[in-house]
């Protein structure tokens, strides 16, 4: 998916996906990030910033350390307020436009069922696979229970399928 976006779509769409899968933010929160936020981080020599999540209204630290140089290089190319600018005036792209671009890239990469939550779920899935820390992931995603978090990222079904695939009496 990253390859399809990087090679065949705009840098804006690639960066939206890259930041989405590395932060687990909802698309509505991603679209509100301003270019100056990234530029200020470089000046302050830090690679994380606070955001107030739209759905939960909770503040969260967003860490971009692993992708900061790439995000900063992209931000420097923009002459717009928004990190993911629309071509229609000084505003970010809409959630619908983000969805359309992800759908097109998914079709190109032969990936079915791509949506705007795909980035958040991908982050959650790989965070859990790498750390096995469901409590921390639950906190990051602001879920009320570990069970909701595991169901959201598809782990329960995957683990159940793996067990049943090898189950024999």
What are these regions (language model features)?
Residues 1-23:
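Basic, Lys/Arg- and aromatic-enriched nucleic-acid-binding interface segment
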Residues 5-8, 99-139:
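Short, basic (Lys/Arg/His-rich) helix/loop patches that form interaction surfaces
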Residues 16, 28-33, 137:
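Alpha-helix N-cap/helix-start motif at helix boundaries, enriched for small hydrophobics
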Residues 32-64:
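Conserved tyrosine-mediated DNA breakage-rejoining catalytic core shared by Y-recombinases
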Residues 33-35, 59, 89-93, 97, ...:
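Catalytic phosphate/metal-binding cores of nucleic-acid and nucleotide-processing enzymes, i.e., regions
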Residues 38-42, 133-153, 158:
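Short, polar N-cap/turn motifs at the start of nucleic acid-interacting alpha helices
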Residues 51-56, 146-166:
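Catalytic-site neighborhood detector that most strongly recognizes the C-terminal catalytic loop/helix
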Residues 54-72, 82-103:
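C-terminal catalytic core of Y-nucleophile DNA break-rejoin enzymes
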């Amino acid at each position: 998916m990253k390859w399809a976006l990087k090679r065949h779509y705009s840098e804006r769409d690639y960066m939206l996906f890259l930041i989405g899968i590395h932060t687990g933010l909802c698309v509505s929160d991603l679209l509100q990030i301003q270019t100056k936020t990234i530029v200020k981080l470089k000046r302050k020599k830090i690679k994380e910033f606070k955001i107030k999540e739209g759905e939960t209204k909770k503040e969260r630290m967003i860490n971009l350390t692993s992708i900061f140089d790439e995000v900063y290089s992209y931000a420097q190319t923009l002459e717009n307020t928004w990190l993911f600018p629309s071509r229609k005036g000084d505003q970010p792209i809409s959630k619908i436009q983000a969805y359309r671009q992800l759908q097109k890239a998914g079709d190109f990469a032969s990936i079915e069922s791509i949506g705007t939550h795909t980035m958040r779920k991908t982050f959650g899935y790989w965070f859990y696979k790498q750390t096995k820390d469901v409590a921390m992931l639950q906190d990051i995603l602001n879920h009320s229970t570990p069970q909701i978090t595991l169901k959201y990222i598809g782990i329960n079904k995957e683990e159940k399928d793996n067990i049943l695939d090898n189950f024999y009496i």
